[in-house]
Amino acid sequence: MKKILIILTNTRYYGNSKDKTGLWLAEAAEFVYKVQEHGYQVDYASVNGGEVPLDPRSLKSTYRSKEIDEIYYSNDFQNRALKHSLKVSDLDPQDYFAIYYTGGHGVLWDFPNQPALSSITNSIFKQGGFIMSICHGLAGLVTIKDDQGNYLINNKKITGFTNFEEILSG
């Protein structure tokens, strides 16, 4: 059975500051909860592989639920997503029927202009797979070009995180 590839950030800080960022927990955990509920298998990957930091703000009770916590506290998520994510460049796109770009501000630094992400996303798309993102995860899709040099999102309807949502999230 082919799997869904979940792309996570390795970025721990906003640019060169000491302000912490990372993966927005709910944007991975809610998705994982739903797809696993329907019998799909997932792999977790990041540009560098290895550790994936969590945005501390995403751990507030306001952004948590029973389902999010079920995934977050699971050994599988702790080990395969947060401690030992796979390195994107080591993966075979033939193993996946979909790719999902998670959010959190960290992705703004390590998702755009990444050859390994572009390559695996294009391959999954060319084999008829699904390309998905949530929130800031869209940053990973806006720079990807197809084999003809056209942006992959050209002539597609897309959504992303609004400035108003930035204000609401603090």
Segments predicted by a language model, with ranges:
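Short, thiol/selenol-centered motifs that function as redox-active sites or metal-ligating centers
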Residues: 134-136
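Extended, subdomain-level signal for the structured scaffold at the beginning of enzyme domains
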Residues: 1-127, 140-170
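Conserved, well-structured core segments that form or line functional sites
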Residues: 131
